[in-house]
Amino acid sequence: MAEELPELALCCDGTVVEGRSNCRCKARAVLPGGMRVRLSKTLAGILRHHPGRYGVRLTREGWARVSEVVEGLRKAGWSWVEEWHIVGVALHDPKGRYELRNGEIRARYGHSIPVNVEPLPGEPPPILYHGTTEEALPLIMERGIMRGRRLKVHLTSSLEDAVSTGRRHGNLVAVLLVDVECLRRRGLKVERMSKTVYTVDWVPPECIAEVRRESLGRSL
């Protein structure tokens, strides 16, 4: 299922909100939901994987100038993009993918290029979820959850988000329930990177407490 998000509106007072009806004054401009999703995916690609394609420079902590991102997007054919679009996408991202500060932006997680993003404070819940497909299960149960092309394995505290992730990779969704205490006993540090996303270097097979088939709503 494709991600769906409401429109973003730039209000006359300079604020960016979801839905023009939420402006306290007249909306000056609107970013439709479909375009918002496309822009967010492109932004994630720039900040996580290939900033150089767009002429964007990242610091060691993953920060980029918003103005530089806008310039890179415009040169790549996104001629309509303005800074408020980038700020709005970041501020209202439902998964907390992005962080803003003083005219800069970065992705909080998901990188395949080496950056140093400090974790957020807060302890993980006892169980975290990882969405995948049934086709991938045999290898996962043998080797554990590997990081693949990313710097870290990504887990979530949201069952709904795990199901959504699994659906992006196939029709037969499997959700893995990961025992956080098991990870700790094996010296694996779990770090909180957004309001629902946590990262770890690896999940050993023995730390997978349960596997659920989402389509049937029961354990395998």
From Swiss-Prot:
Q: According to the UniProt entry, what is the EC number of this protein?
A: 2.7.1.-
Question: What InterPro entries does the database record attribute to this sequence?
Answer: Ptrans_KptA/Tpt1, RNA_2'-PTrans_C, RNA_2'-PTrans_KptA, RNA_2'-PTrans_N
* Keywords tagged on the record: NAD, Transferase
Q: Does the keyword NAD apply?
A: yes
Q: Which Pfam families match?
A: PTS_2-RNA
GO MF, any single term? NAD+ poly-ADP-ribosyltransferase activity
Q: Looking at the record's lineage, which domain of life comes first?
A: Archaea
**Which Gene Ontology biological process is one annotated for this entry?**
tRNA splicing, via endonucleolytic cleavage and ligation
Q: Which family does it belong to?
A: Belongs to the KptA/TPT1 family.
- Function comment: Removes the 2'-phosphate from RNA via an intermediate in which the phosphate is ADP-ribosylated by NAD followed by a presumed transesterification to release the RNA and generate ADP-ribose 1''-2''-cyclic phosphate (APPR>P). May function as an ADP-ribosylase.
What name does UniProt use for this protein?
A: Probable RNA 2'-phosphotransferase
